[in-house]
Amino acid sequence: MIISAASDYRAAAQRTLPPFLFHYIDGGAYAEYTLRRNVEDLSQVALRQRVLKNMSDLSLETPLFNETLSMPVALAPVGLCGMYARRGEVQAAAAADAKGIPFTLSTVSVCPIEEVAPTIKRPMWFQLYVLRDRGFMRNALERAKAAGCSTLVFTVDMPTPGARYRDAHSGMSGPNAAMRRYWQAVMHPKWAWDVGLNGRPHDLGNISAYLGKPTGLEDYIGWLANNFDPSISWKDLEWIREFWDGPMVIKGILDPEDARDAVRFGADGIVVSNHGGRQLDGVLSSARALPAIADAVKGDIAILADSGIRNGLDVVRMIALGADTVLLGRAYLYALATAGKAGVANLLDLIEKEMKVAMTLTGAKSISEISGDSLVQELGKSLPTALAPMSKGDAA
């Protein structure tokens, strides 16, 4: 199979993975309107082509939180990553480390903090949810700090799980889910051998370490559903700061007022994100939300963005809309499921090449030169910058 883009990895992952795993990462909330808009809105962002700009010394290096990234990309936290490839978190972290970008370990990873951190040179980031069990949260923060994690990604857009209809149909949840997953695994022998058998244990490593007992997929569904905390408030950031003195990024911001509050409560960064369209269907795409948020807090706090990013051109678009760096989620998981560490490494190489092409043809020699000036502004006045659909004349 020829791999030239993230879409090729998606097609390959769909063949490789049991349906319950493919649709768990591929799907979104409710009717998946926001999931689609994340990609569609970003694809409508039009860039200004510039020529004769002498682009011989182009650089993608990006400073962030006292680190220097080789390009403005980090791997996002993805739950159950180790179910998509054998010890998947370790493989993905190795690919990110080799590329010179951060890897973010999810609270609900298969591989625990202590297994992943020693395998890479670059300090990884750690993601944490607000949960009813504050003992678990404190334990996770202390373990992340002891393992040398540099940055905390605090996910705040899950006070309750989103309703994901695909999961009930695919076997991740719903009637007879365990039996359906078993038969799906039998019908996908490559995954069953490589991950199902040789990727064990399939514990939720960070939770097992705290509870002192093995935790499987059913525990993941039950324990998390009962532990998300709807009482979450900005005051929780003050509690977090008692146990974490490093950079803290608030993930799940879609409104400028919330972005201002993040600044006011001492966050070091925000992630403009709708959780990949997996939480509340019908909210703004990240691309639509980003310009107003950047107008409100640019320069006061680091702005990261995710949701809908599938290639290097999308990275440039997000930065032009106001992001400093992006998080890559689904795209890297497709690559991981297809070819493990090598797949993620190849995807990151593709993204780097695509970014260089986009920057060369827009006349931006560095990441700092990508801005609103890189956008075509006259596509329409009624929608946020550069997000109005083109007319028939424009499309020509």
Curated annotation (Swiss-Prot):
Give every FMN hydroxy acid dehydrogenase domain span: 1-380
> What are the recorded GO MF terms, alphabetically?
FMN binding; L-lactate dehydrogenase activity
Name the EC number(s).
1.1.-.-
> Gene3D superfamilies annotated for this entry?
Aldolase class I (3.20.20.70)
UniProt subcellular location: Cell inner membrane
SUPFAM superfamilies xref list: FMN-linked oxidoreductases
One Pfam match:
FMN_dh
What residues does substrate bind to? 24, 129, 164, 278
| A GO cellular component entry from the record | plasma membrane
> Mainly localized where?
membrane
Does the record's keyword annotation contain Cell inner membrane? yes
Binding-site residues, FMN: 106, 127, 155, 251, 306-330
A single GO BP term for this record reads: aerobic respiration
Q: Which reaction does it catalyse?
A: (S)-lactate + A = pyruvate + AH2
Q: Needs which cofactor?
A: FMN
Q: Which UniProt keywords apply?
A: Cell inner membrane, Cell membrane, Flavoprotein, FMN, Membrane, Oxidoreductase
Q: Which residues form the active site?
A: 275 (proton acceptor)
Organism's domain of life?
Bacteria
PANTHER family, per this entry?
L-LACTATE DEHYDROGENASE, S -2-HYDROXY-ACID OXIDASE-RELATED
Q: What is this protein's function?
A: Catalyzes the conversion of L-lactate to pyruvate. Is coupled to the respiratory chain.
- Write out the similarity annotation: Belongs to the FMN-dependent alpha-hydroxy acid dehydrogenase family.
Q: What protein name is recorded for this chain?
A: L-lactate dehydrogenase
| UniProt organism field | Salmonella newport (strain SL254)
